[in-house]
């Protein structure tokens, strides 16, 4: 049996046990999963560090000098789609959107839906993408493109020839990944391939759906990832799906390997839209454990918890002009409680590296649901405020220290980027450094005026 056959048979990679050591089982009671969350966060998201503080001239600073150590960015990616940037109802809404997005998050998902992005063949809407990229750069926001391939709606101009349609799809993947190399280096390459042939997409995307059927799901995802990798060899490539059952692993992930059996993907993307019902801690943990067995990082790519009535059937009522899926006080309280629980569980799992919220504001949110972290009028919901307290408070490091022997300062902090500062003779000196899991030796920090 070759490596690919072994992976298909076992449903995991050679490093499948890496993320699952000493963790609770998926069928453990809710209390154990939650009670141990802070302990796991302390273990997996923080570390001890030693800083060697030197001056602008490269010489050690004197012992006894006090320094402040301030985190400026998380390594973990806390994100949201950024579809409404500069597209809110009023200039005031746009300003509020930008301010609150930047205050909370460090990761933005940009739209690349083919049928919208290239409404006329050969005329992609790159200008809008470049506008968002510039904003993200100005706010030190990591970017991701979503998605390069998804048979959800056929572009109107797509020829009704499956083989040609697939050629155009692969060409499109290459073009986007190559054009935005350096600006967007994280991509959802293929979206929702597990159940690619469900009835709704057969109606909306008959050409692409038939092209996938004819090519075969395994060949389709492999060729898509090869095209993206060739266009941007250093990109982080995700497979993404709403299916969290074994079918995703068996039908797609286990197929997404080279002839020698090595994964063609870098990250496994998991959608978690909870319009109908909130996931229990056990279900959330089970999803993490199921896909961590592949030995690759996990991104929760599309997370929704509504702040109003729950139920997928409510989207069907949108045709009624008198119906509004509204946010409520009770729903907002429930949303906040569930969001904090969900994020604590995910942040405590060592395989998870990113969480992306789906729709920052209720304005034109997907399914017209009250899914935002901020309301229709751009005021923050309790969920936003609670996340801010976690991400920039409880999970954020601010520390003081005194330079000791050898110009060293010891501290413990969350992984991410930091600024160190001190004052000498009325002058403020600052320097920066990065702390991550790979940091083992003393980090040299040069302080300058």
Where would I find each of the regions flagged by the language model?
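Acidic-and-aromatic substrate-binding clefts and catalytic sites of carbohydrate-active enzymes
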Residues: 84-93, 115-127, 153-155, 194-198, ...
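Twin-arginine (Tat) signal peptide motif
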Residues: 1-7
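Beta-strand-rich domain onsets/edges
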Residues: 26-85, 119, 144, 216-219, ...
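Glycoside hydrolase catalytic-domain groove-lining segments
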Residues: 130-137, 211-239, 247-320, 343-347, ...
């Amino acid at each position: 049996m070759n490596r690919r056959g072994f992976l298909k048979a076992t449903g995991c990679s050679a490093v499948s046990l890496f993320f699952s050591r000493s963790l609770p089982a998926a069928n453990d009671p809710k209390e154990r999963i939650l009670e141990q969350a802070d302990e796991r966060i302390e273990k997996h998201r923080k570390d001890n560090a030693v800083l060697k503080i030197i001056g602008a001239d490269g010489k050690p600073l004197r012992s006894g000098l006090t320094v402040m150590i301030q985190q400026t960015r998380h390594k973990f990616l806390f994100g949201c789609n950024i579809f409404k940037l500069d597209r809110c109802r009023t200039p005031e809404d746009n300003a509020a959107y930008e301010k609150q997005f930047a205050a909370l998050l460090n990761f933005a998902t940009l739209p690349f839906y083919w049928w919208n992005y290239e409404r006329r063949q050969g005329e992609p809407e790159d200008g809008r993408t470049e506008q968002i990229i510039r904003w993200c750069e100005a706010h030190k926001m990591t970017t991701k493109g979503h998605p390069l391939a998804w048979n959800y709606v056929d572009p109107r101009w797509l020829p009704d020839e499956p083989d040609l349609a697939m050629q155009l799809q692969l060409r499109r993947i290459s073009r986007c990944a190559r054009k935005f190399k350096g600006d967007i280096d994280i991509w959802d390459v293929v979206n929702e391939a597990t159940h690619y042939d469900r009835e709704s997409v057969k109606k909306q995307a008959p050409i692409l759906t038939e092209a996938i059927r004819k090519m075969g799901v395994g060949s389709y995802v492999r060729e898509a990832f090869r095209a993206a990798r060739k266009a941007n060899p250093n990109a982080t490539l995700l497979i993404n799906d709403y299916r969290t059952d074994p079918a995703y692993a068996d039908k797609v992930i286990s197929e997404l390997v080279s002839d020698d059996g090595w994964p063609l993907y870098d990250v496994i993307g998991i959608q978690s839209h909870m319009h109908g019902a909130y996931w229990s801690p056990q279900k959330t943990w089970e999803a993490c454990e199921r896909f961590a067995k592949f030995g690759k990082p996990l991104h929760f790519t599309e997370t929704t918890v509504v702040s109003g009535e729950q139920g997928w059937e409510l989207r069907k009522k949108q045709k009624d002009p008198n119906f509004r899926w509204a946010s409520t006080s009770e729903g907002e309280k429930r949303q906040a409680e569930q969001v904090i629980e969900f994020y604590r569980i995910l942040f405590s799992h060592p395989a998870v590296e990113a969480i992306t919220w789906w729709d920052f504001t209720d304005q034109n949110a997907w399914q017209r649901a009250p899914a935002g972290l901020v309301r229709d009028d751009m005021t923050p919901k309790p969920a936003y405020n609670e996340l801010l307290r976690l991400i920039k408070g409880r999970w954020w490091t601010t520390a003081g220290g005194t330079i000791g022997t050898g110009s060293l300062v010891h501290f413990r902090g969350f992984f991410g980027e930091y600024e160190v500062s001190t004052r000498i003779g009325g002058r403020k000196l600052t320097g920066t450094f990065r702390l991550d899991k790979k940091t083992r030796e003393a980090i040299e920090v040069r302080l300058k005026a």
